[in-house]
């Protein structure tokens, strides 16, 4: 999922009121680096989380995002790189498409973090809708928020748009071992929500490694995990523990089950 890191950063920025803007792609045409639903967070200190192009469009987007935050208003951008004149003039940016962006100042969206948290916990997809008169509404499961913001007088495009961010993919890892920390880090970096199911004391870490840690039997953990995982990995390095997990997993509809074992 490309949404985990921008949304996590946007939640922290909203709570901190640190002058960041969330920029979301609400529509595209032609050849673009991203599709509708892509997003990035632009911070007041020139930090950026997420990409909307190969790097050619971000400087102008960041400039407009800073103005939106400073003015406390919604803004929109319509970036069209399909003009043949750009190719002949040598100013083409490497893609021939159109992006329609909505720019939202996170300081003006109190409670945004609770929606991101509900989405992350599996309450439901995160829907976001912006109307032309500045009403922003968002929902994740039963969590609903609505805000009304002024619209930039200089908005180069209609600010209206809507998108739905699907739930992040979820994986349950049954059994921990020496490779767990690295594997979990990779999965989280790729946007997965990671739960480790492990009862053996020697493998239970003192610090936060996964998004969730279940000190339960595989059967009890699977009964408790909601929503159900999209994938499961069995890797106890122990025959009986692996067998116990596989027996429990055989009763589920999880579409992918992987088993780590000797070659």
Residue ranges and their predicted role:
Residues 218-228:
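Short amphipathic alpha-helix with an adjacent loop that forms part of the alpha/beta core around
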């Amino acid at each position: 999922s490309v949404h985990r890191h921008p949304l996590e950063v946007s939640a922290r920025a909203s709570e901190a009121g640190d002058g960041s803007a969330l920029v979301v792609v609400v529509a595209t045409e032609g050849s673009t680096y991203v599709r509708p639903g892509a997003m990035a967070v632009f911070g007041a200190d020139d930090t950026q989380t997420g990409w909307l192009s190969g790097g050619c469009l971000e400087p102008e987007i960041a400039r407009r995002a800073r103005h939106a935050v400073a003015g406390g208003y919604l803004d929109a951008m319509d970036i069209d790189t399909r003009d043949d004149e750009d190719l002949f003039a040598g100013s083409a940016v490497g893609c021939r498409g159109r992006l329609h962006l909505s720019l939202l100042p996170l300081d003006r969206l109190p409670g945004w973090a609770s929606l991101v948290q509900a989405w992350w916990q599996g309450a439901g997809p995160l829907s976001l809708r912006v109307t032309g008169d500045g009403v922003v509404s968002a929902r994740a499961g039963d969590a609903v928020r609505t805000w009304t913001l002024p619209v930039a007088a200089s908005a180069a495009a209609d600010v209206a748009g809507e998108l739905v961010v699907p739930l992040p993919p979820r994986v349950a890892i049954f059994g921990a071992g020496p490779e767990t920390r690295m594997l979990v880090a990779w999965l989280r970096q790729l946007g997965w929500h990671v739960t480790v199911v492990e009862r053996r004391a020697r493998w239970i870490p003192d610090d936060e490694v996964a998004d969730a840690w279940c000190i339960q039997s595989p059967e009890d953990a699977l009964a408790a995990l909601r929503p159900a995982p999209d994938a499961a990995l069995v890797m106890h390095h122990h025959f009986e523990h692996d067998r116990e997990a596989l027996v429990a997993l055989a009763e589920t509809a999880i579409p992918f089950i992987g088993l780590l074992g000797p070659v």
